[in-house]
UniProtKB/Swiss-Prot annotation:
Main subcellular location of this protein, as a coarse class: host cell
Pfam families: Baculo_Ac102
Record-given protein name: Protein Ac102
Functional description taken from the UniProt entry: Nucleocapsid protein that mediates the translocation of G-actin from the host cytoplasm to the nucleus, which is fundamental to infection. Participates in regulating nuclear actin polymerization as well as the morphogenesis and spatial distribution of viral capsid structures in the host nucleus. Suppresses 'Lys-48'-linked ubiquitination of the viral protein C42, thus forming a regulatory cascade with C42 to control P78/83 availability as an nucleation promoting factor (NPF).
Subunit composition and interactions: Interacts with protein C42; this interaction suppresses C42 'Lys-48'-linked-ubiquitination and subsequent proteasomal degradation. Interacts with proteins P78/83 and E27.
Keywords for this protein: Host nucleus, Late protein
This protein's encoding gene: Ac102
Length: 122
C-alpha cells in the first residue's frame, strides 16, 4: 500500500468494525414535528365528512350495483358514464371498446387511489 493512504490509524480493522457496529446500533431518526403534523392533518382531512371522495361515495352507496353513486360520478367522469348504463340495465357483461376501457380503468384507478373529489351540482 501507499504510505499516504495508511497515514491515519482510522482504517484499522478494529476501528472499521467499531464504526459499523455504531452505525447498526444507532436508533432510527425520529420524524420531525412538522412531518408528524402534516400526517395528522392529512388523516383529519381524509376523515372529515366535508371532503367526500368517490371511494367514500361508492362505499356508502346502498343501491344495487352502486347506481346512485355512479349517476353522481358520471357527470365528472367518462369512465363512470361508461359503467352506468350497463349497471342500470343489470347487464351480466359490459362491452367496452379500447378507449372506453382505458377511461374505465383510469376511473377505477382514481377511485382506488382515492383522488377524485365529488362535486355535487344541485
Amino acid at each position: 500500500m501507499i504510505a499516504s493512504i495508511n497515514d491515519t490509524d482510522m482504517d484499522t480493522d478494529d476501528n472499521m468494525s467499531q464504526a459499523r457496529r455504531n452505525r447498526r446500533n444507532r436508533p432510527p431518526a425520529r420524524p420531525s414535528a412538522q412531518t408528524q403534523m402534516a400526517a395528522v392533518d392529512m388523516l383529519q382531512t381524509i376523515n372529515t365528512a366535508a371532503s367526500q371522495t368517490a371511494a367514500s361515495l361508492l362505499i356508502n352507496d346502498i343501491t344495487p350495483n352502486k347506481t346512485e353513486s355512479l349517476k353522481i360520478l358520471s357527470t365528472q367522469s367518462v369512465g363512470a358514464r361508461s359503467l352506468l348504463e350497463p349497471m342500470q340495465a343489470n347487464a351480466s357483461t359490459i362491452k367496452l371498446n379500447r378507449i372506453e376501457t382505458v377511461n374505465v380503468l383510469d376511473f377505477l384507478g382514481s377511485v382506488y387511489d382515492n383522488t377524485i373529489q365529488v362535486i355535487v351540482t344541485e
